[in-house]
């Protein structure tokens, strides 16, 4: 779909726009091209080419220009949809309700701006907010009919996903049946996140290292990749977990239960039905200042959680108010993600040094241009063994994607081979 020259051009344009943000009409199309390319690499090729924060900055630039020049908004703009493309491994199915993205915030000022917009949309200053962890995994949609789990699907492009029902049934934390009938519900669609416990992930990487395989970069990639394995028993062996965080649709035979009047109430109800929900970590607040204080405090505790989180999600608690506020084609107006400091960045591979251990084992160590990630400046990264170097196809001079998650040591996720100029040297 994209030639090497296309990829180099798009990366160069993205780098320029990240340095000097766009402000002119002529840059709208460039931003659309960059974001469409990034989406294709992420959702279709499973190869993210930008750090999350870089992508969000580019997306916000496009949104800013389209707000400034609304007459130039096109139906195929990335802001009009969620993502693109599907794998052909699993059958495609339609979500009952589109799985939209979340708008992102990064600081107190962003949250206060969102609070003002919420009050404008809701027509009142009296808004209760629910705050919960934003788990860093793979999103799924679950359908229960007459109390039985009948379908599970990946997020896909937000409209269509890949059916992974058999694999989802291998996740021990997901009930195969639940008593929705007690509230007169015959069909329900639930949203959740598939994750891997930090200890399970560390053990799995130890097993891979013992087999001479490269460690997986992060739990998110491990969860996403595992869901799409064709062998359900292998899925079972990898010990995935799931956390559900939203009821997107339901069919009632009687009156609506009180538990479905609020977001917090609905997750508390699901928890009592046997579903893993974030009720123990969730908090409800009456002011945005309380929300901001909680966000600041929670970020310092993120590494204490058993699963990786990359932020918090703030939602209007009242379902009635959510319905009144509505949504855009990209995200609900009643929810926003508060993103923690980035733990992923790009750098340049300067050289590889070989260190000899006490037992005589030789470990290759990558030396990179200093880059701050998660509050730490990273300059050296272990490559574990020669097999990892070969598997990742690293070259001196490569631009590399580096990640540091929780207390895990930094990884080189991969080289950005599309940026090679021909001057790089194979290790």
Q: What do these predicted ranges mean?
A:
Residues 1-427:
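RNA/tRNA-interacting regions in translation and RNA-turnover enzymes
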């Amino acid at each position: 779909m994209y030639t090497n020259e296309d990829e180099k051009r798009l990366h160069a344009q993205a780098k320029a726009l990240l340095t000097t943000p766009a402000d002119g009409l002529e840059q709208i199309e460039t931003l659309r091209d960059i974001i469409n390319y990034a989406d294709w690499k992420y959702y279709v090729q499973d190869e993210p080419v930008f750090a999350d924060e870089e992508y969000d900055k580019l997306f916000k630039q496009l949104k800013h220009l389209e707000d400034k020049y609304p007459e130039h908004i096109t139906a195929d703009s990335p802001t009009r949809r969620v993502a693109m493309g599907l794998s052909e491994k699993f059958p495609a199915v339609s979500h009952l309700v589109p799985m939209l993205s979340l708008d992102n915030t990064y600081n107190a000022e962003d949250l206060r701006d969102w609070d003002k917009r919420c009050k404008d949309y809701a027509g009142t200053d009296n808004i209760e907010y629910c705050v919960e962890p934003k788990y860093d995994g793979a999103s799924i949609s679950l359908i229960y009919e007459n109390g039985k789990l009948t379908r599970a699907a990946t997020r896909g492009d937000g409209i269509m996903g890949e059916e992974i029902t058999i694999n989802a049934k291998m996740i021990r934390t997901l009930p195969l049946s639940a008593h929705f009938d007690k509230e007169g519900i015959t069909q329900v669609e639930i949203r959740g996140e598939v994750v891997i416990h930090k200890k399970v992930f560390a053990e799995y990487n130890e097993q891979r290292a013992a087999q001479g395989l490269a460690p997986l970069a992060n739990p998110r990639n491990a969860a996403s990749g595992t869901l799409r394995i064709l062998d359900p028993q292998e899925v079972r062996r990898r010990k995935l977990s799931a956390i559900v965080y939203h009821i997107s649709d339901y069919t009632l035979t009687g009156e609506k239960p009180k538990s479905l009047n609020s977001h917090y109430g609905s997750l508390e109800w699901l928890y009592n039905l046997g579903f893993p929900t974030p009720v123990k970590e969730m908090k409800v607040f009456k002011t945005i200042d309380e929300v901001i204080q909680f966000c600041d405090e929670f970020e310092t505790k993120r590494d204490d959680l058993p699963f990786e989180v990359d932020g918090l999600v703030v939602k209007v608690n009242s379902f009635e108010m959510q319905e009144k506020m509505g949504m855009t084609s990209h995200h609900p107006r009643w929810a926003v993600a508060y993103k923690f400091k980035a733990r992923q960045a790009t750098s340049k591979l300067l050289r590889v040094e070989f260190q000899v251990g006490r037992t005589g084992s030789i470990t290759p160590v990558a030396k990179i241009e200093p880059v701050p990630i998660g509050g730490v400046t990273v300059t050296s990264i272990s490559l574990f063994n020669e097999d990892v170097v070969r598997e990742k196809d690293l070259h001196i001079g490569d631009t590399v994607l580096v990640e540091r998650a929780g207390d895990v040591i930094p990884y080189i996720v991969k080289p950005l081979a599309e940026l090679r100029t021909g001057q790089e040297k194979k290790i």
